[in-house]
Amino acid sequence: MKKPVVIGLAIAAIVAVIAGGTWWYQSRQDDGLTLYGNVDIRTVNISFRVGGRLASLNVDEGDAIKAGQVLGELDHAPYENALMQAKAGVSVAQAQYDLMLAGYRDEEIAQAAAAVRQAQAAYDYAQNFYNRQQGLWKSRTISANDLENARSSRDQAQATLKSAQDKLSQYRTGNREQDIAQAKASLEQAKAQLAQAQLDLQDTTLIAPANGTLLTRAVEPGSMLNAGSTVLTLSLTRPVWVRAYVDERNLSQTQPGRDILLYTDGRPDKPYHGKIGFVSPTAEFTPKTVETPDLRTDLVYRLRIIVTDADDALRQGMPVTVKFNDEARHE
């Protein structure tokens, strides 16, 4: 065989190998489902549960935040005063309840009995005086006005006696169950007010609810804040979720737990790894923010993909290409 022919065959073989390799690579790249999504934006608006003057803020925008970290404080003074007042209220209610349970002392009962005897004597005198006045009035010795004054004194003495007798009876039988129950309810109410005062004072300290990065610092020390008004906005950096959408035709490929490859423009040759964590049970129209070659009017299902090897380069809102090919199972 002539030398030029051999060279030609060799070149043809090389071209065939290159073409075959290119076709194989492209077929591997195009194999499987490809979706487009974004890293979920997850933020928390942090606020005080109570209102007041902002005394301090210990963090600034961009700071890394740890769960349980003290972020700021309100002026404690009004809430410390309310707490002392609530403690005093509990002491008063407790003393009243204890008094109701203990009943009356022997000395108090003796004093009440003496008051009854005194009232009885006063009534007897008033009754006798009234009787004498009646006789004098019949004989026209006194006027009708004198008789009426005697009757009024007798009635007043009778009322005083009745009051003293009722008091002695109460002292001897003890407090009524209804009075004891009312005193107990007052004590429980005072304790509840104390617990609320303690909670309010505790809530003058702002605690980070989770790890993350501080996005915004909305107010500055010295500001008067209403309860619930936003003080800080925290970006939740872990776990990292990717939101993507799949149409009904490919829904069967998106079982929860399936391994996924995630590509970003910043590192196209080094994918992140993830797993499908959630598939929405209801369809929706494709959101405008999603990059997709299909019609945006298609009904799709939302996916949540949990990134298992996320780093700080994977930022919230970043566009992501989601690959479902077999490479995800082996990497």
From Swiss-Prot:
N-terminal signal peptide: 1-19
Regions annotated as coiled coil: 107-208
Keyword entries, A-Z: Coiled coil, Periplasm, Signal
The keyword Repeat is assigned to this record: no
Pfam families: HlyD_D23
Gene Ontology CC terms, in alphabetical order: periplasmic space
Claim: Coiled coil is one of the keywords in the record: yes
Top-level taxon of the source organism: Bacteria
SUPFAM superfamilies (alphabetical): HlyD-like secretion proteins
Subcellular location as annotated: Periplasm
Matching NCBIfam families: PRK03598.1
Family classification: Belongs to the UPF0194 family.
This protein's name: UPF0194 membrane protein YbhG
Species name: Salmonella paratyphi B (strain ATCC BAA-1250 / SPB7)
Gene this protein is translated from: ybhG
